[in-house]
Amino acid sequence: MNNFIFENKTKVYFGKGGVKEYLGCLLGNYGETVMLAYGGGSIKRSGVYDKVMGILNAAGKRVVEFDRIMSNPTYAKAQEGAKLARENHVDLILAVGGGSVSDCCKVISAQANLDEDIWEMQYKKHTLPTKFIPLSNTLLFTPSSCISVFPGRQAVLRMDCKRSGSCSR
């Protein structure tokens, strides 16, 4: 086993009705533009979309939607989200859904403020950036994890981005 340091300053809110109870008060900690990221239509059919949009609108947030995140999202999909976040000066990414949405948004969070392709960065020796867009996951029936796994060109990008900005593959 290699020596390492793990620091986790993450708050996790649990419970039925947690989105309604906690999301509104947490939004005040971030700027005005929120990227609402989700997969298919299940969040609309279930009513989650309307609840979340109601909370965002009540908080006076400008919402940029990033939808159709598929199961096992592609790296290209994450890059599309990063471009959208960058162009709209997103202050917070709100990922609503399961593990695929969460994984995609972790890459978006890291890539949006970079000039260099994060995929290429894993093959170079350098100091990784520490400026990420804050990410809030509203996970539905999925465990939370700080690791993001992406199928890619010829390999898999396994991003483990911690507050210190370190990534492992």
What are these regions (language model features)?
Residues M1-E65:
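An N-terminal, well-structured beta->alpha segment
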Residues K9, Y30-E32, K61, E87-D91, ...:
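Short coil/turn connectors at secondary-structure junctions
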Residues K20-G24, Q79-G81, E120-H126:
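A generic local structural motif
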Residues Y22, K44, D103-C104, S144-S145:
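Glycine/Thr-rich phosphate-binding loops of Rossmann-like dinucleotide-binding domains
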Residues G40-S42, G98-V101, F141-P143:
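Short glycine-rich anion-binding loops that position phosphate/pyrophosphate groups of nucleotides
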Residues G47-D117:
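N-terminal small/polar loop signature for handling phosphorylated ligands or for N-terminal nucleophile
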Residues L114-R169:
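A glycine/threonine-rich phosphate-anchoring loop and its flanking beta-alpha core
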